[in-house]
Amino acid sequence: MDHSIVLKSYGKINLGLDVLRRREDGYHEVRMIMQTVGLYDVLTMKKRKDDKIEMTCNLSFLPTDERNLVYKAVKLIKDKYHIKDGVEINLSKRIPVAAGMAGGSSNCAAALKGMNQLFDLGLSIDELCEIGVTLGADVPYCIWGGTALSEGIGEKLSRVDAMPDCYILIAKPGISVSTAFVYKNLDLPALSKHPDIDGMLECLKEKDLTGICNRLENVLETVTIKEYPIIEKVKKHLCLLYTSPSP
């Protein structure tokens, strides 16, 4: 019972994110290219002698009960496969919260993989993804990792050419943005320009890092920048740093 497993839960960025339409069920149909980055949380899991799920986290403001996707994932697997043992979980967060980096979905994906490993369930990646999509649209991608084209509500995944190795600077202002708020306030008919997803795919194929950088675009910024002008300020500052001559 003392055996524990340690899993890295990687964050992601969107190289390009387009929203095509709002579906009748309230979800939005998207077309986006996602990329795993080197920043990760750490999930430690081990069996308990009782049947309880106990979760701890280094961030006191995050819930550690049924409201947390990790807890939900563990409970779902326990119930689905009639697992009697309990599970002890520790989550050490490094990925910024509410930053659009799929931290929660990545943690959920790691928990599903952890349960598969901890209890020798023998589930395939496809089977884990089928379970994961019931917990969140980004979870299947986080199970995959790497570079992928995501379509539908995020559950239709296609492996695409990997992004060239490079350093990525991630800036997170002191704000938290609700994904639900952003999608609710997205005015699709008013969008005059959409990200060049096909062009991005071609640049990935050609390993054209400059072309990739020139096509970085996210339609959700039409909402977030209006609501949080600091985002535009940070972007402009980073551009000035990039174009400033060396001393």
Walk through the language-model features, giving the residues of each.
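ATP-binding N-lobe of GHMP and related small-molecule kinases
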Residues: M1-A99, Q117, L121-D126, M163, ...
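ATP-dependent small-molecule kinase catalytic core of the GHMP/sugar-kinase superfamily
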Residues: D2-K8, K12, G16-D18, R22-M32, ...
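Short, basic/glycine-rich phosphate-binding loops at helix/coil junctions
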Residues: D51-C57, A111, D208-L216
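Generic structural signal for hydrophobic residues
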Residues: V70-A73, A111, V234
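Conserved cofactor-binding/catalytic machinery of classical short-chain dehydrogenase/reductase
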Residues: N107
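Conserved small/polar residues in nucleotide/adenosyl-binding loops
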Residues: Y242-P247
